Each structure stands twice: as structure tokens, then as C-alpha cells.
Amino acid sequence: MCESCQRPASNGIIVPRDSGPLTTSALEKSQKQTAQCKQEQPGAAVPGQSSQVRRPHSRGRVRSAGARPRRPDVRSMTRPADRVISLFTFAVGVNICLGFTANRIKRAEGWDEGPPTVLSDSPWTNTSGSCKGRCFELQEVGPPDCRCDNLCKSYSSCCHDFDELCLKTAGGWECTKDRCGEVRNEDNACHCSEDCLARGDCCTNYQVVCKGETHWVDDNCEEIKTPECPAGFVRPPLIIFSVDGFRASYMKKGSKVMPNIEKLRSCGTHSPYMRPVYPTKTFPNLYTLATGLYPESHGIVGNSMYDPVFDATFHLRGREKFNHRWWGGQPLWITATKQGVKAGTFFWSVVIPHERRILTVLQWLTLPDDGRPSVYAFYSEQPDFSGHKYGPFGPEMTNPLREIDKTVGQLMDGLKQLKLHRCVNVIFVGDHGMEDVTCDRTEFLSNYLTNVDDITLVPGTLGRIRPRFNNNAKYDPKAIIANLTCKKPDQHFKPYMKQHLPKRLHYANNRRIEDIHLLVDRRWHVARKPLDVYKKPSGKCFFQGDHGFDNKVNSMQTVFVGYGPTFKYKTKVPPFENIELYNVMCDLLGLKPAPNNGTHGSLNHLLRTNTFRPTMPEEVTRPNYPGIMYLQSDFDLGCNCDDKVEPKNKLDELNRRLHIKGSTEAETRKFRGSKNENKENVNGNFEPRKERHLLYGRPAVLYRTRYDILYHTDFESGYSEIFLMPLWTSYTISKQAEVSGIPEYLTSCVRPDVRVSPSFSQSCLAYKNDKQMSYGFLFPPYLSSSPEAKYDAFLVTNMVPMYPAFKRIWNYFQRVLVKKYASERNGVNVISGPIFDYDYDGLHDTQDKIKQYVEGSSIPVPTHYYSIITSCLDFTQPADKCDGPLSVSSFILPHRPDNEESCNSSEDESQWVEELMKMHTARVRDIEQLTSLDFFRKTSRSYPEILTLKTYLHTYESEI
């Protein structure tokens, strides 16, 4: 599921291991270190204190809090704790959200309904010192001395004169004609005196009003091919301008409402939207932006969460959020500091006005070379505040968007004033979107359960359920799930055990994620009972908007704009997920990223020049290429089709076909000595072409195992001798392909594969013993190109275990949807195979992790099946003749014994299967992590472009 792996520390915080592929030698080294890893005594792993980092396995992936260690690790990420709480002031912005939504739906243990407060666990601080000459100092001063940095309010540790000296507002924030050339007044918030440029404290519009310059927004777009920085700047500084709750569709308001932001967008690099991580809440997403980690990996799985090991609850208003033990991973400001790059503050107390934040960043940019940071951040609580209060479509939203744009204009005017507007890189980014939600659209669990007082529900736009009392022996998650599943025709939530959630959410492998999870329909809330929802005395709701829904929902998408000398000029890029931004920010600063969930290099197309060039991972296991090695009599399948073959001498010919090392019709005919060289394929499925079924190269196996390449006329497979089934099966279907029927005599039997040892083959006997299990085929017999080729589809090496209920899904996909996609896209290549993820960590399971087998056999039962469907992006080109960019859609389908996830599964498959598949859409990278395979290894496209393809998620949503 991600690019790196983690191990839990003794306090439960998990930190990532190095990302990237392992070479064989690195893998051996990793395996040798495993024993040492298990003996280490981990310490606290917090952002800024000692952490444990794991070395990568073949594809790498970050482990989450509470997960079992799987890979060795080494010590790293040590820094002073003085920067740790930078992130905690996110609470400032989130308290606003809390005021309109979270505290209006009570949890079982109750919400704090008091006014926002500043909480601190810091020791008592003497505030008798002074902030004179110290306002917004970059070095945090520890107790017992008082502080003057931007976080002192959060810790109640400011010097007594902080407000007087550092939060000045006299004179306002802008110059007027009357103020130009004024006598310096130190009580003013900013200055318009003749010496203000030299002293670095001018109001941002000083040169516009007093010197006749133009506003930045009024200048034409200019292509900045190289940074134009003053002397002393080692690298272009990076300013991250983050906005809370900025729905991507707000950008449609354009230059009439947001002229400065629109200029950044049109002159720089932008995407139609950026996808947040799930849950689409503020704390998880802001920390994901800072670390590149999924919430299950960095540990901040929600704005509110309970840790069963700590026996403590993390709240936006509680003191626990200040405890380092909750925060995992390595945020950008620590990565910078560890590599000798100074970082300014990232987050601000709400009492500091936006104008003061901008002026402070600009003043930091004028510091001497040895004290000037290279990375800064600005955070705005808007438009989230107004979005919750008025809803995303309320006319009241225009003013807060104008205010944000005004602040952006102040920043850009200030940079131009300092002659840094061609030097600095600016990222304008949101954390999540906003949806139209009111308390009138609330589902109450009391309408489904009789014992809601026995549970604790984290309510709202998603639901997380745990027992109210930890020692409740009667608490039965499966029974609760059953009582919440498909009980009403108009039900607006869907219950899941967390391991059954769509894999694309990456929201299971953390002890802070409750076992029961409710995915709530957009525009709806969930609560325990009506008394848990507060309303105004008039009966109206306190809020009109909220967020937290499925991260593929279009209303949850947010904004990304990159502007500056390192970003491309006037460039639109495809949407991407926010886990990828950490690597980009590191590239902009010349840093080596800490291990993270992003795919480094997948966003290279955003930048004018790239300091990081990704390389393809090395193959760990090469395949065997077996010929005919066994006799028919060696096999006892219990359901042999050989006696159904007519005429009898045709059996030898069918087996000889399997000896062909290649997949072209010409090679097959040459081997068989066929006289029908020009025989037309009546189904149109076959188009002679070498490697026709591996259009993008053979998938590489990135772990040690044994597997064989098995060629057939209509498909090719990588057959595992360990798992007794293909790791992958690939086939190409043309637009003209026809779906054919299956002869009755082939519906209940399979053929032995004389290339594979009977000891490495499945048997129908096992399925006869297991009444709950059946089998299916990875290549669909329905799409066979000829009667002879259909026999290949019934080889035992094409067989995989499947629950009867799941076969309904799989057969409909193969029989109907593959043909549909091939027709729509001018042919497709399909790669399908099994997934084993019993510990639901998003990583490929080794054999010791597998918990279920076909009864009385060594045939493992997959937890999921995957399918990757690729075509030419230009549908006028056939899939097997594409010379341009590719288009991909992928699925990770849960392999379960029932279809209760779809409430209408009793109906015809056409009514529900495709919708179920869309729910379980996935990235190719997700599949690679779950299989330890590497796809698309031989294409005409650059490797960074292939990484972009692999990280693409087809959301099946309407336009933003």
C-alpha cells in the first residue's frame, strides 16, 4: 500500500522505513538484519525525537501504528524536540470546524462544549521577560524562559509584552497616499517610511502606493526559466500556502473573485484537483502533506481517536494532542533541519492575524544568509470556517475566498517588493474539500441497534465504532455489522469490518482504527441517536457543510497550484494524491526524502528540472520456461476433461500446443504443421503479433520464489509453484472480440498441464472436499479465440479458488465487462491475479501469514483478486498498436463468501457488479504493493510517466 515499511515503537508510534526497491543484495542484507530488529528496544518515535526506520523490502511500504514488524530497521531521525509541536497548532483551524460540526454531534463520552481554549502540558513559564527585538524568533526558547515565537500562545508561554510588541495593528496593514514617507512609528503594524525597504518591514503595497509600481497580479505572466535570486540565496526558498477546506470547484469562481490565485494557477502548474487521503479530515491530511504518509502509517487517523495501548483519547480540544507519542513519521521541517536546511514555522496560532503571518514570512526572507530559512508555511483556517457555517454553495462563501485571495496578493506583492517574485517557489494547496451537509440528513444507529448505549461512535461524515467499555464480553463486532447491513432500502451508510474496506483507502492497519467502520453517503451524517445531535432553539442546524467522506468523492477534492522558477510554466497536470507532495517539496529544497508512502518521481512532470530520476526496481526472481515434462497418466485431478476430447488423437495436439515458447499464431501453426495457414479467426480475438499478450513487458517478481512462464494462444501466465496458481495472467482482447459459449461437457472439468509437476498443481478433489469453495479461471474461457484454444482456458494452471458468491462477480466481469471495455477503448490488455493480505497491511503476504486454505489441501485462498485494464489513451489507436500515452483502470476485488456489500446482490449481476467494482477501484501501485510485482516494464513511455500512470486512480466521479 505504500512505499516504505515501519515497525512499532514501545509507545505504539510507527515510523517508516526507507522507500524504494530492493536489489537482491539489499534483500539479503535485509533478511540478515531481521533477528537484530526483533531484539531492539524501540524508543519514542515522534516527529523530532528518536525514531526507528525500517529498510525496504522489494517494493517498500510504510507500516502503521500497532502493526507487527515485518522488516528490519535502523536508527535515524533524531532531532531536538523544539519543533515537534509545530503541527499541533493545526488545532487552531480545526477548532473552528469543531465549533460547527463535531461538537454538534455528541459522541457517547460527550463533547467539550466550552469555548475554544489553548491547552498546554508545558512546565510553568516565567513570563516576566520581554519580546523586545525577539518577535517571532525562529529559535524556540525552553522553560523557564518566556517565548516570543509564533507558538507561544499555544503553550501559554509568551512573554508578558508579546501582544503589545508582536501583534501590533496600529496604522493598519497597508500604505495609503497619506502614509507615504511617514515618520517611522514603531507602534505601527507595518511601515510606509522611506527606510522601510532597507529595514524589511514595509507594508506589502508600499511600492505600489508610494513608488508607482504595479501589483503583481496586474503584471503579465512571465516564464521564469531560471531562479532570479539576490546574492546569498543558496536555493530558491519554498513557501507553502495551505488553506483549510478549499473545495476544488471553488477555483471555478475565477479571477472575478480570486484574481491572485487565478494568476498563480494560469501562469504556473496546476491540477484540476488534488485527492486528499481518507478520512478527508484536517488533522490526518495536514500531517499527510507534511510527511507523505497515509494516516494509518503516521498514526493520526482522525481528528479524534482512541489508542487502546495508551488507553488515552486524542481530541482537538484535549491536552493529549500535545503528547509526542501520537505523532509518527518525519515531517518536512524535520527532514530539512536534519539535512542542514533551515525551516521557518509551519503553523500559526489563530490569534495571529493573516496579515501578520505574511509580514513575518517576508521579514524572515530578509534575514542574513546564515539565519534565513529556506522553507516557510502559511496556514489559513478559511474557507473551512465559512464552508461549515454556510455550506459550499452559500453566497456567503464569496467573501472568505476574496479574503484568502487578498492574502495571496499581499504575499506576492511583498515578494515582488523584495525582488523575490522570480526566486521563490510557491505551493498553494488545500487539505480537503467541502460538501453540502445538514443535521437533517442524519442516520441514527438507534434505528438499527438496540444497544447503542453500549458502544462509542465517532460520528459525523464517517462512523467508527468501538465498545463503550473495554471489558464488555458481549461486544460482538460481527453481530453489529450484521444488524447494520442492508436493513433499509434507503440506508445512507454501509458497515465494514476495517479489513474489508476498499484497499484504496489504506485505512485498516492501525490499532487506533476501530474494527467497525461506517462509510457514509455524501451529504449525510451518522450518529448514535437523535439526542446526540444539537440544534439551535429554532430547530435549525448549526452547520451547512462538512467533510470526511470517501476521498474519491468529487466534493472532497481540493486545490493544488505550483508557481515559481522550478515549476513548469502554464502547465496542467493530471490529478494526484497528496501523499506525493512531500517528495516534490523535498526535490524543490534539494533534500533526500524520509521514507514515505508517495512514489518518488511520479510528479516529475510538475517541475522544470528534476533532481531525482527514478529507476526501475531490479527483478528478484527470474522465471522458468518449462516444456512438456509429464504424462497425462501422472495426474489425478478428479475432474479430468481428457475423456471429453474428440477425436481422441486431438489430445496430443492440444498438449503439443503448450510446448510453444511464444504466442504468435504463425509460430503455433509452424509447430503443428497446419495446412490452414490462412484460416480466419471467426471470433476476431486474435491478431498475430509477438508478445501480443504482454504488451508492456513481463511483470517482474520482487521477492524470492519459484514460478514458471506458461504460454498459450490466447493468454500468458506467471504460474507460482508455491501458491499453486498464477501470480498473474495477461491477455489482450480486440475491439472486435466476441463472447462465446462454453460446451456443457467443459463446465465441470479441467485439463492437466503437462508442463507443471502434479505436486505443484491443483486438483478438483480438494474442491469436492470443501463445500464452501469452488474455482474459477483467470483467463475467461468465454473469450477464447477458437474451439482448440478454449481447451487451454480449462487447464488446471488457469484455475484459482473462488467462493461461489464471488464467482458471480468474476464471471460477469469476464463475460460482460471485459468485452464492454474492449469495445469502448478499441481493445484492452488485461492482467489479473490473486492477492493475499490476511494481516491487512497492504503488503504481499508471505506463506506464514496465510490463514485459509481450500479444505484438506495446500491451496491458499486469496483475500482479493486484482485486475489491471490498459488501453491507449487515444482510443482511435488499438491497444496492441498504441504508440502514445496509456490509459489504465484497476480493481482490487474483495474475495468474500457473500455479496452483502451490495444490498441488491439478489438481482441480476448487471444491476450491481459494475458499481461494486467502481467502489473497489485502485491504483496499479496498490496492486504492486499487495503482490510484490512490478508492471509496465517495457513500454515506449519514460519511466516517470509510467510511475504517474501507476499512481493514477480512476474515481468514476463526475467532473469537479
Predicted regions and their residues:
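Secreted, short cysteine-rich peptides and small extracellular cysteine-rich domains stabilized by multiple disulfide
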Residues: T127-T214
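N-terminal signal peptide
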Residues: F90-T125, G129, T169-A170
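Active-site-proximal N-terminal segment of extracellular/periplasmic enzymes that hydrolyze or transfer
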Residues: D219-T269
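Domain-level detector for secreted/extracellular nuclease and nuclease-toxin modules, and
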Residues: D440, T621, P626-Q632, C639-I960
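Active-site neighborhoods of enzymes that stabilize oxyanions during catalysis
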Residues: L457-T571, F576-V584
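Short, structured active-site-proximal loop/turn typified by the sulfatase FGly-forming signature C/S-X-P-X-R
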Residues: S249-S297
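His/Asp/Glu-rich, glycine-adjacent segments
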Residues: T288, G292-G391, P489
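A long, amphipathic alpha-helix that forms part
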Residues: A231, H354-D369, Y376, P383-V424, ...
